[in-house]
Amino acid sequence: MTLGAATANDPIDSTLASPSRDEQRRQANQAAFSRDLEFLSSLANPYYLNHLALSGALSSPSFKRYLKYLDYFRHPKYVKYLHYPQALHFLDLLQNEEEFRLACRDPAFAGEVMAKQIGHWATWRDPENAAGQEQDEAGEQGEARETTGGQTA
């Protein structure tokens, strides 16, 4: 036998050529985990939620079962891989709040949720700044009520 030539009876070369069952299972599990993590992360995007709502996916029973399956990411063993933890909050809302699923159909709602997320990201490390913004917003709302005669839109 020449060096480097593999034969069907050579156990070393055949194990290198095809992964073992355990290795195949590990690779399949890794691919499924990566797919689930990527999908769960995408739930942090309100515009993607709007797309899912408009496509009808949010009302599909099989999709609702998949959302329930994703609950395993709440376990500390898996949650550490999430870059967007608010995805778990949206997952909870999608699983349990019909009103939220319906609201996701409205692009204006998606924009409002996105604006709130951005506002949170801008201030979450600076609670004093966040409190000041809340006071400013409350003051603006009070001024708006005064100009509309106390009526809200």
Curated annotation (Swiss-Prot):
Keywords recorded for this protein, A-Z: Activator, Nucleus, Transcription, Transcription regulation
Main location: nucleus
GO molecular function: transcription coregulator activity
GO CC annotation terms, alphabetical: core mediator complex; mediator complex
Phosphoprotein as UniProt keyword: no
Nucleus recorded as keyword: yes
GO biological process: regulation of transcription by RNA polymerase II
Subcellular location: Nucleus
InterPro entries assigned: Med31_sf (IPR038089), Mediator_Med31 (IPR008831)
Region (Disordered): 1-28, 125-153
Family classification: Belongs to the Mediator complex subunit 31 family.
UniProt function note: Component of the Mediator complex, a coactivator involved in the regulated transcription of nearly all RNA polymerase II-dependent genes. Mediator functions as a bridge to convey information from gene-specific regulatory proteins to the basal RNA polymerase II transcription machinery. Mediator is recruited to promoters by direct interactions with regulatory proteins and serves as a scaffold for the assembly of a functional preinitiation complex with RNA polymerase II and the general transcription factors.
Assembly: Component of the Mediator complex.
Alphabetical list of PANTHER family matching this protein: MEDIATOR OF RNA POLYMERASE II TRANSCRIPTION SUBUNIT 31 (PTHR13186)
This protein's name: Mediator of RNA polymerase II transcription subunit 31
Originating organism: Mycosarcoma maydis
Annotated gene: SOH1
